A protein has these predicted regions:
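Acidic, low-complexity, intrinsically disordered interaction modules
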Residues: 6-116
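Mixed-charge, Lys/Arg-enriched low-complexity segments
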Residues: 118-123
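Short, intrinsically disordered N-terminal pre-domain segments
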Residues: 2-4
Length: 123
C-alpha cells in the first residue's frame, strides 16, 4: 500500500493507494486499528472489496472516446484499472484508471488529478 500526503483547501490528509488484494488487507487492518467499529459504520466495505477484486488489472473501453477506425470497425480508447485511492474511509473511494498507452506511475496520475492539484508528496 502506498501512502501519500495531500494538501488541499481543507488542510492536509493521507491518501492511501491500493493496487493489490494484499494492499486491501493491510488497509483494512489499519482501519480496524484506528476504529474498532469501522465495519459497523462502513457496511459497504466488503462489497467494494469484491468490486476491487473483480476490476483491478482489467482493461475496459471507453465507448465515448473513439481512437480510430480500422477496417470500418471502431477502436476505442482503452483504460486499465490500476488502483483505488481513499483519503477518508468513511467517505468516497476513487478508481485510478490509466490509458493503456500511458506509462506514468500512480503518483504522477494522482498529482495530475483535480483532487490533488494543490500538491502531493510521498509521506
Amino acid at each position: 500500500m502506498e501512502t501519500y500526503r495531500m494538501k488541499g483547501i481543507y488542510g492536509e490528509g493521507d491518501v492511501y493507494v491500493l493496487k493489490t488484494i494484499e494492499d486491501w488487507d493491510e488497509y483494512e487492518k489499519l482501519c480496524r486499528e484506528r476504529n474498532s467499529d469501522f465495519l459497523k459504520y462502513n457496511p459497504n466495505f466488503f462489497s467494494l472489496k469484491e468490486d476491487f477484486e473483480k476490476y483491478i488489472g482489467k482493461v475496459w473501453q471507453d465507448k465515448e472516446q473513439l481512437r480510430y477506425t480500422y477496417n470500418d470497425e471502431p477502436v476505442y480508447v482503452e483504460y486499465k484499472v490500476i488502483a483505488i485511492e481513499d483519503n477518508n474511509p468513511m467517505m468516497d473511494w476513487y478508481w485510478i484508471v490509466q490509458n493503456v498507452d500511458d506509462d506514468r506511475d500512480v503518483k504522477s496520475i494522482l498529482a495530475n488529478s483535480c483532487d490533488l492539484k494543490n500538491g502531493i508528496k510521498i509521506k
